[in-house]
């Protein structure tokens, strides 16, 4: 595992992204994607995961927010992958149930070096402000695939779409923080001997 600050830049015809990540940080966020609601969710994720995360994204938001949201997920996933593997000396598995008022979301994840996403959230509304709620799943799919983690996100209940999405980001944050908890007794957390 790599504990230093990692950096990655990704430039396409649709987005220009620069990102810095420190997996054992203190929850410091410096986020600018040009999408206010998405920035708010990434700041909540950073705070509760205790990662340090700096993101600058300039995207074709005049088209829609899809490219920016998905590409931020891709870059975050790639940095997590670089930081995590080969995995050693951490819990590996993490889970969290997070509530926000009437909304409750459960997250379970495995730092398995095996990419998989189960996403069962049923957002009440198609938009929060100008943000298309279907992009939340696209973001988490990009993170899971590019980080090679197995990620399950399940809405237990909820009516307010903002609350549901925020509980989703926070449950992922807390589960990731727990999976990254150091445990020197574990060594490589797999009977295969490598992850």
Curated annotation (Swiss-Prot):
GO biological process: L-histidine biosynthetic process
Record-listed E.C. numbers: 4.2.1.19
A molecular function (GO) term: imidazoleglycerol-phosphate dehydratase activity
Enzyme class (EC, first level): lyase
Catalytic activity field: D-erythro-1-(imidazol-4-yl)glycerol 3-phosphate = 3-(imidazol-4-yl)-2-oxopropyl phosphate + H2O
Pathway: Amino-acid biosynthesis; L-histidine biosynthesis; L-histidine from 5-phospho-alpha-D-ribose 1-diphosphate: step 6/9
Subcellular location: Cytoplasm
SUPFAM superfamilies per record: Ribosomal protein S5 domain 2-like (SSF54211)
Positions of transmembrane segments: none
Source organism, top-level taxon: Bacteria
One GO CC annotation: cytoplasm
PROSITE patterns on file: IGP_DEHYDRATASE_1, IGP_DEHYDRATASE_2
InterPro entries for the chain: IGPD_sf (IPR038494), ImidazoleglycerolP_deHydtase (IPR000807), ImidazoleglycerP_deHydtase_CS (IPR020565), Ribosomal_Su5_D2-typ_SF (IPR020568)
Keyword flag Ubl conjugation: no
Keywords: Amino-acid biosynthesis, Cytoplasm, Histidine biosynthesis, Lyase
Family: Belongs to the imidazoleglycerol-phosphate dehydratase family.
Protein name, UniProt field: Imidazoleglycerol-phosphate dehydratase
Organism, scientific name: Campylobacter concisus (strain 13826)
Name of the gene: hisB
């Amino acid at each position: 595992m790599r504990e230093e600050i990692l950096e990655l830049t990704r430039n396409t015809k649709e987005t220009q992204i620069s990102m810095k990540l420190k997996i054992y940080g203190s929850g410091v966020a410096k986020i600018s994607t040009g999408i206010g609601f998405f920035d708010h969710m990434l700041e909540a994720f950073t705070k509760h995961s205790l990662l340090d995360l700096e993101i600058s994204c300039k995207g074709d938001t005049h088209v829609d927010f899809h490219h920016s949201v998905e590409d931020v997920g891709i870059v975050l996933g790639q940095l997590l992958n670089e930081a995590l593997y080969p995995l050693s000396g951490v819990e590996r598995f993490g889970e969290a149930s997070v509530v926000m008022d009437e909304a409750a979301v459960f997250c379970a994840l495995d730092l398995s070096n095996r990419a998989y996403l189960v996403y069962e959230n049923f957002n009440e509304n198609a938009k929060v402000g100008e943000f298309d709620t279907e992009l939340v799943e696209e973001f988490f799919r990009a993170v899971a695939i590019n980080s090679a983690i197995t990620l399950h996100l399940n809405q237990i209940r909820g009516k307010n779409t903002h609350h549901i999405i925020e509980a989703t980001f926070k449950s992922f944050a807390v589960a990731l923080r727990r999976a990254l908890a150091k445990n020197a007794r574990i060594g490589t957390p797999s009977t295969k001997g490598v992850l």
